[in-house]
Amino acid sequence: MVAAKKQKKTIESINSRLALVMKSGKYCLGYKQTLKTLRQGKAKLVIIAKNAPPLRKSEIEYYALLAKTGVHHYSGNNIELGTACGKYYRVCTLAITDPGDSDIITTLPESQV
């Protein structure tokens, strides 16, 4: 019970930080744009939904490793990630190039590669 509350709280804090990035920062949504941003070396953090296809997930992780970029595995599916981003469509991957006013890059524990 306690672990479920803590997990819900961390999801809400990640969602609030994502909303702040959407308002004040720069980002790329989608698989192709994320790969393009990683190849250019502009991405600071990559967020992948839980139900992303394994091949795409491993490919993004590989490019992030080469670019020395942090990867966070979002605990919700792509519909929940899209909702957290304030979009009405599904978002499987998301690359943050400029966090803006948000401290999402420094606060995510799994983001260090």
UniProtKB/Swiss-Prot annotation:
Molecular functions (GO terms): RNA binding; structural constituent of ribosome
Superkingdom, taxonomy of origin: Eukaryota
InterPro entries: Ribosomal_eL30, Ribosomal_eL30-like, Ribosomal_eL30-like_sf, Ribosomal_eL30_CS, Ribosomal_eL8/eL30/eS12/Gad45
GO CC, any one term: cytosolic large ribosomal subunit
Key words of the record: Ribonucleoprotein, Ribosomal protein
PANTHER family membership: RIBOSOMAL PROTEIN L30
Family designation: Belongs to the eukaryotic ribosomal protein eL30 family.
Name of the molecule in the record: Large ribosomal subunit protein eL30
